Amino acid sequence: MSSPRDSRFALPLQVAAVCYRRVNSHAEFLLVNTNGGSKWTFPKGAPEPRLSHSQAAEREAKEEAGASGIIEPRHFHIYVHSKGVFWQPGGVQEYVVKAFLMDVRQTRSPEEDYRNPTWFEAERARVILAKGREVKYAHELQTVIDRALEHIGVARMAAAR
């Protein structure tokens, strides 16, 4: 299924739910396995015609991570993401992704059970999002975590562990 294009961007558009919860003085992020199962990512997908972008991101969080909560109506960050590998038919496709923060209040089994939703502390999420990705895309995903922490008012802890 192809993603719709936003006229402001040359790449197809996706929406992501950056699911978090506060635990004491830090934040944890809910990540899901990619379709291939070898990498971790945020719940995301194509916008839906009858839903706002935040509503579509909220739906992705429910389907892929089994998460529900309070999603912000406006995106807090935009990043570039890739799918595929150059040696497969179709190669690599890049997407522009609008990221929406979701304060998760409840989780249940996701509709897409192979996604294995898992909570990670921010520093671990930064590492695991980068694993197996090209530097450019790894940095994009790590920046999402950093921007999310800024937005929710949680200081980033040093990775001195």
Could you describe each region identified by the protein language model?
Residues 26-68:
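Conserved Nudix-box catalytic region and its N-terminal flanking loop in Nudix hydrolases
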Residues 18, 31, 99-101, 119:
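Conserved hydrophobic/aromatic beta-strand scaffold that supports enzyme active sites
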Residues 1-25:
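Acidic, metal-coordinating catalytic segment for phosphate/diphosphate chemistry
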Residues 62, 66-107:
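Active-site segment of metal-dependent pyrophosphate-handling enzymes
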Residues 38-39, 107-161:
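Nudix hydrolase/Nudix homology domain
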Residues 22-28, 89-92:
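Short, solvent-exposed loop/turn segments that connect beta-strands within catalytic domains
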Residues 23-25, 36-39, 48-49, 80-83, ...:
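Short, charged/polar surface micro-motifs in flexible loops or helix N-caps
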